[in-house]
Amino acid sequence: MFIGEYQHALDPKNRIIVPAKLRDGLGNKFVITKGLDGCLYAYPLDEWRILEDKLKTLPLTNKDARSFVRFFFSGACEVELDKQGRGLIPQNLKEYAGIEKDIVSIGVLSRVEIWSKEKWSEYNESNIDFDSIAEKMNDLGI
């Protein structure tokens, strides 16, 4: 399980330096893809396989399902870290997430979300009504 928030930056060669606490769970090789809300999602390989299996069951006849699978898999790639915990994020994914230098990585249960520092700040400063969200979670039994 991934938890916590970590602020860091791309190195001079535009590589992400994965914080040690997140690296332990992700492993030296993981999958990164376009996430929702303008961030990137990083999954350990075993979690990625579970997600693949679930998405394979979506009906091809459903347009929204096809669109989501295309969105999710078209940006996906494996990232392999070097001994210092650095890995290269493809340019198309950096552009999608608006990542230029400063990064915030957050642990979210089975995945790591990678945000540009600016987008993460905007997200947290937006008018999200957490009380309303909490009420909806109650409706889901949480």
From Swiss-Prot:
Main location: cytoplasm
Keyword Cytoplasm part of the UniProt annotation: yes
UniProt keyword terms in alphabetical order: Cytoplasm, DNA-binding, Repeat, Transcription, Transcription regulation
Alphabetized CDD domains for the sequence: MraZ_C (cd16321), MraZ_N (cd16320)
Domain named SpoVT-AbrB: residues: 5-47, 76-119
Gene3D superfamilies assigned: Transcriptional regulator MraZ domain (3.40.1550.20)
GO biological process: negative regulation of DNA-templated transcription initiation
Matching InterPro entries: MraZ, MraZ_C, MraZ_dom, MraZ_N, MraZ_sf, SpoVT-AbrB_dom, SpoVT-AbrB_sf
One GO location term (cellular component): nucleoid
Single annotated GO MF: DNA-binding transcription factor activity
Compartments (UniProt record): Cytoplasm, Nucleoid
Family per record: Belongs to the MraZ family.
NCBIfam families: division/cell wall cluster transcriptional repressor MraZ (TIGR00242)
Subunit structure: Forms oligomers.
Protein name: Transcriptional regulator MraZ
Organism: Clostridium beijerinckii (strain ATCC 51743 / NCIMB 8052)
